[in-house]
Each structure stands twice: as C-alpha cells, then as structure tokens.
Amino acid sequence: MGRIRQTFIKRTGEELIEKFADKFTSDFEENKKAVEEVAMISTKTLRNRVAGYVTAKVKKMNA
C-alpha cells in the first residue's frame, strides 16, 4: 500500500504534465529541476512531492 497524495499535488502535477510534457522524464532528479524551472512552488518539500508524482505518472505512461 502506498501513500495517498493530496489533491493539490495531483492537480499541479497533472497541469505541469499537460503543459510541459517534453520537459519531464522518468528520472526524479531531472524532474525536480524541471518543476523548479516551470512552477512557482514555494517550498522544497512541496516541489519534491510534485516531482515525485510527475515521475510516477511518466513511468506509468511509458509502461
């Protein structure tokens, strides 16, 4: 069983994937940098959670 992500993280991640799909890969470290570039996220923790969600989504789409 995994952790359930908050709606804000899911919504933000979905919007970023929709707008900037070409910037994201299945690598978390690269996605952290990409999220920092394209989104105005105030805290490191929130940035990492959004990047983790985006990474998981990209991995699912490529599988």
Curated annotation (Swiss-Prot):
Pfam families: Ribosomal_S17e (PF00833)
GO biological process: translation
Keyword Ribosomal protein among record annotations: yes
GO molecular function: structural constituent of ribosome
Keywords associated with the record: Ribonucleoprotein, Ribosomal protein
Keyword Lyase set for record: no
Taxonomic superkingdom: Archaea
Gene Ontology CC terms, in alphabetical order: cytosol; ribonucleoprotein complex; ribosome
UniProt-listed HAMAP family: Ribosomal_eS17 (MF_00511)
Entry similarity comment: Belongs to the eukaryotic ribosomal protein eS17 family.
Protein name per Swiss-Prot or TrEMBL: Small ribosomal subunit protein eS17
